[in-house]
């Protein structure tokens, strides 16, 4: 599947350079290029999630993410990712498994293991707009959203974000996919600031259907690691 991440994805984004000059690229070309980043055939990431409430109280959650690509029936790749929470003690052993199928007609398969209950909960497609482990991220923010569900347009073809020149691109569900897209994401529309140099999402915002609020995403601590542009810090605020 070709996907984009409203939140830039929890495992970071990597550089992919499409053919053609910047002037020739359409908004769809750019979002497809963001999706087609090289991230290797397998990866292991150590992450820390910090939840901050309205009283500025913080809760820290440490997790490790394992991701691996497998050959698909079409000759492309299916991706399986396992997120394993290591701390704090009350959620240690909680695991989230996602199968991202190459077949665009097939929805992701996702499961959440809750050790305190010793049960596995299947995440239905109608639940992917729910909060992921009490955070401002949803399952859809983490898994990604189908590019083909959306029409993309330029809001601004040149805008600076922290000194980085970006395209500002808006995503609105196509009429034929509107109900499915809104159910899966909980968003009526999204906007992304994409770096013209690295094709990383520097900033994003999503209009929530519930509560009529806007969710804001910000990427920071961007580093070139082993010739790969990597986002090391990602913030979501609702």
PLM regions: where:
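Short, solvent-exposed loop/turn segments that connect beta-strands within catalytic domains
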Residues: 54-57, 72-77, 104-106, 160-164, ...
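Short, intrinsically disordered, charge-balanced linker/junction segments flanking boundaries
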Residues: 17, 22, 237-238
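N-terminal mature ectodomain segment of secretory-pathway/periplasmic proteins
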Residues: 23-116
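Positively charged n-region of N-terminal signal peptides that target proteins for export
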Residues: 1-5
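Gly/Pro-enriched, hydrophobic low-complexity segments
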Residues: 32, 86, 97, 109-113, ...
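Bacterial N-terminal signal peptides
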Residues: 7-17
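Short amphipathic beta-strand and strand-loop transition segments with alternating hydrophobic
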Residues: 64-73, 151-160, 220-222
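Alpha-helical structural motif
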Residues: 9, 26-30, 230
